[in-house]
């Protein structure tokens, strides 16, 4: 025999709402993965100089739950402390080989969260991801890239933003 428990709100011992139902099956839960953002290349032409580590500023916001990503600086500065999952991808629009491709996810423009390297390929997407603790006030993250193809090279702009992107979301406190 099955049991039925009916409630329109589930609270913890502190009286904080964990789960709420409107009675019609629509649930409201805590925003546990917020703040979050995801930006990509869409309509941008981004040129990266040869053999130079360059910050990539993506301006097409798909999601920015707390307005924590600044499209003018390329910085994500969440105002909620916690551990964040950070990810990014870079693809160059080039038909020749690279001697060196790099992607770097950085905290406060100093410590590297994650890096990836690739060599001697063209139309290669390089990805990086990792976790980082952010203090909820001054800590920020950015995405950087470096390419060595002998001359400046553009990031691929395939109009749907699936090749070049950067994002993060909170995974815990």
Where are these regions (language model features)?
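Extracellular jelly-roll beta-sandwich "head" domains, especially the C-terminal globular C1q domain
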Residues: 4-5, 28-173
């Amino acid at each position: 025999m099955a049991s039925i428990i009916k409630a329109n709100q589930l609270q913890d011992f502190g009286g904080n709402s964990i789960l709420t139902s409107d009675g019609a099956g629509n649930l409201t839960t805590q925003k546990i993965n917020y703040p979050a953002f995801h930006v990509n290349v869409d309509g941008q032409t981004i040129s990266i100089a040869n053999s130079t580590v360059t910050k990539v500023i993506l301006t097409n916001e798909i999601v920015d739950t707390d307005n924590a990503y600044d499209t003018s600086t390329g910085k994500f500065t969440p105002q909620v402390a916690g551990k964040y999952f950070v990810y990014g991808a870079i693809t160059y629009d080039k038909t020749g080989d690279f001697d060196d491709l790099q992607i770097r996810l950085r905290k406060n423009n100093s410590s590297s969260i994650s890096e990836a390297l690739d060599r001697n390929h063209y139309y290669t997407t390089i990805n990086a991801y990792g976790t980082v603790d952010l203090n909820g006030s001054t800590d920020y993250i950015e995405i950087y890239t470096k390419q060595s193809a002998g001359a400046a090279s553009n990031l691929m702009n395939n109009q749907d933003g699936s090749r070049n992107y950067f994002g993060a979301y909170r995974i815990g406190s």
